[in-house]
Design a protein with these regions (language model features):
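Eukaryotic helix-linker segments that join adjacent hydrophobic helices
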Residues: 1, 18, 22-24
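An alpha-helical repeat/solenoid feature that recognizes helix-turn-helix modules
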Residues: 1-14, 32-64, 74-191, 198
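Blade-loop segments of beta-propeller domains
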Residues: 28-29
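Beta-rich carbohydrate-recognition and catalytic domains
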Residues: 67-68
Length: 198
């Protein structure tokens, strides 16, 4: 409703949905559920992107998510699913009730970083942050390349498009990068745009 029809917090259904989401936000600031009790920067960012677009950008709950996202970045300035940085598979969701902390020395995931950057791009203040710009450069460096992790690892996933945006693909990445203020003259952006011309 938010992406396709522009619904915002004035609509009772959106207000009720936001209230529900805020009710299960963790003390740390993230949203959990899709991976059980495991951290999920992409899940938290995906929810928060819609909240920002629905008019909650100044809400304290949203601010807490941004603080959490910045605290859980990899050392290279991107994001990854923390349990993946510990070489865990999806079975960790059922087997581990304890939340697995990330190994921040491991590389970022382009898929996760692209999803997280969408919430930064949606927010008028955070889109101008140095952290968003650093992560944007990382995302561009991976265009048409394989991800570092198992989830949607193949380079072919760059060309599996969806709207509303869900995972990171070429269109969602270009949309995000443009909102972050990157120039169309960047080499990787030119290469990405050339794909559409061919």
């Amino acid at each position: 409703l938010v992406e396709e029809f522009g619904f915002c917090k004035e609509h009772p259904a959106i207000a009720k949905a936001a209230e529900y989401l805020f009710s299960f936000q963790s003390k740390e600031g993230d949203f959990r559920g899709i991976y059980g009790n495991q951290y999920s920067p992409n899940y938290s960012a995906g929810i928060t992107e819609l909240l920002v677009k629905a008019g909650y950008r100044n809400d304290a709950h949203v601010q807490r998510v941004f603080e959490w996202l910045l605290s859980i970045r990899q050392e290279d300035a991107g994001w990854a699913i923390p349990f993946r940085t510990r070489n865990c598979n999806l079975d960790v969701i059922a087997k581990h009730s304890e939340t697995i902390r990330p190994d921040k020395s491991k590389p970022f995931s382009y898929m996760v970083t692209g999803v997280v950057l969408r919430v930064f791009a949606a927010h008028p203040t955070y889109r101008k942050s140095k952290e968003a710009h650093q992560a944007g450069k990382l995302l561009l460096s991976m265009v048409f390349k394989k991800d570092h992790y198992l989830d949607r690892a193949g380079a072919e996933y760059w060309l599996r498009f969806s709207f509303p945006f869900w995972f990171t693909d070429l269109i969602s990445a270009l949309d995000t990068i443009s909102l972050l203020g990157f120039s169309a003259q960047e080499t990787q952006i030119e290469q990405a745009l050339q794909w559409f011309v061919k």
